[in-house]
Design a protein with these regions (language model features):
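A generic structural motif
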Residues: 111, 175-180, 280-303
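Conserved segment of the helicase C-terminal RecA-like domain
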Residues: 1-45
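Amphipathic alpha-helical transducer elements in NTP-driven molecular machines
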Residues: 17, 21-28, 51-54, 87, ...
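Conserved, well-folded catalytic cores of nucleic-acid-processing
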Residues: 4-7, 30-37, 60-64, 79, ...
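C-terminal helical accessory/scaffold domains
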Residues: 222-223, 227-233, 239-272, 292
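C-terminal accessory/connector segments of nucleic-acid motor ATPases
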Residues: 38-164, 170, 245-260, 272-285
């Protein structure tokens, strides 16, 4: 087996963070963690899987026929993967499914599959619970720009038709993305959930940059790129300092956090810290680094972040107003308040983010 990491030649004006071979480091980290610790990424068992809850509810009704709400809850909520789902959450889901006719109430008060639900469960793809790649049409005003799969949420940028566009709205029912042209480049968008990377991998990537070990499985070009990256890291201090000034008011933050802790930090910066820090133009390359412009100095940055991390805030505060972050297959049939709750409390790694932020106090 071979890992092949393809890279574009960096342009002369490329900023330091973009010259580091992140995918190469990630590959090294995965191999080393298995060689040293026999470590593989653990399953995530503490999420709020409302999309899967919908699927299990509909498949249970389809296979058993009429059930009372209590009988249905007894069959579904006792499954170990739903241990964090409360009775109130399940009640909200059932009421919503009755409202949209995916479930129907019989004269005797029992529950059966509704007419709209029949169309879903009779589709041959119903039992494929994982999200599939579906094409979305991208439009700007009256013009059709092309198609993409798995669109990013509003506020993210995409590259299509030779230009950079910011996503304004995603119509999940019509499979349409509405976008506006903007200047600039497009940072890598890795999605909010699929293909997530554990914090342990990022920490091993940092160690690979800071140590001088030679990995015998690397080919010549990979060894050369690693040596170059280690030299860049040593000169810039990126391996030991989380915040680096790139000149003027431009900064880069290396959190060395996994996908969901990184996403939580990004949102805390934008929602809770941006005004006090004079922070703007935050440009993430998840989950490796984020660049931004900031009026505050380094000491103030760490002080403000630590102050926010010490607060016991509600996770839902890190979800933007009006945002409904769909990313699982059946999220569109789940009540919006549960989709938001599932993302805030089941996806974002707020505790992991807080621990890392508070560990930066020595840099303040």
């Amino acid at each position: 087996m071979w890992f092949v990491m393809r890279e574009e030649e960096p342009e002369p004006r490329t900023m330091m963070p973009e010259t580091i071979p992140w995918k190469l480091l990630q590959g090294i980290a995965l191999v080393q963690l298995y060689r040293e610790e026999k470590w593989v990424e653990p399953p995530e068992l503490d999420r709020l899987p409302y999309s899967l809850l919908y699927h299990q509810t509909m498949s249970t009704l389809a296979s058993t026929g009429e059930l009372t709400p209590a009988e249905l809850a007894q069959r579904v909520l006792t499954l170990s993967y739903f241990h964090r789902v409360s009775a109130d959450d399940y009640r909200a889901l059932l009421r919503h499914l009755i409202k949209i006719d995916h479930i129907q109430v019989t004269e005797g008060g029992g529950l059966i599959v509704g007419l709209a639900g029949e169309r879903i469960i009779n589709n041959f793809k119903f039992y494929a619970v994982f999200q599939e790649n579906e094409e979305f049409t991208v439009r700007s005003e009256s013009a059709e720009l092309g198609t993409i799969v798995n669109p990013p949420p509003p506020g993210e940028r995409i590259a299509i038709a030779g230009h950079c566009w910011i996503v304004e709205e995603v119509d999940w029912k019509r499979h349409t993305v509405f976008a506006t042209q903007v200047k600039g480049r497009v940072p890598a968008y890795f999605g909010d959930c699929p293909g997530d990377i554990n914090t342990h991998v990022l920490e091993r990537m940092r160690k690979a940059l800071n140590e001088h070990a030679v990995y015998p499985y690397l080919m010549g070009n990979a060894r050369a790129r690693l040596a170059q990256a280690r030299h860049t890291t040593e000169i810039s201090g990126a391996g030991t300092k989380p915040l680096i000034n790139l000149g003027g008011d431009t900064w880069v933050l290396f959190p060395w956090l996994g996908s969901y802790a990184f996403l939580a930090l990004e949102r805390m910066l934008k929602i809770k810290c941006a005004a006090e820090l004079g922070l703007r133009g935050l440009d993430p390359s998840r989950p490796y680094f984020m660049q931004f412009k900031m009026k505050a100095d380094e000491e103030t940055f760490f002080e403000v972040l630590a102050a926010e991390a010490e607060k016991d805030f509600d996770p839902i505060e890190l979800v933007y107003p009006g945002e409904v972050p769909y990313f699982d297959r059946y999220d569109e049939y789940v009540p919006e308040e549960l989709v938001r709750k599932g993302f805030a409390e089941g996806v974002l790694d707020i505790e992991g983010m807080k621990q890392r932020v508070l560990s930066w106090r020595d840099h303040a």
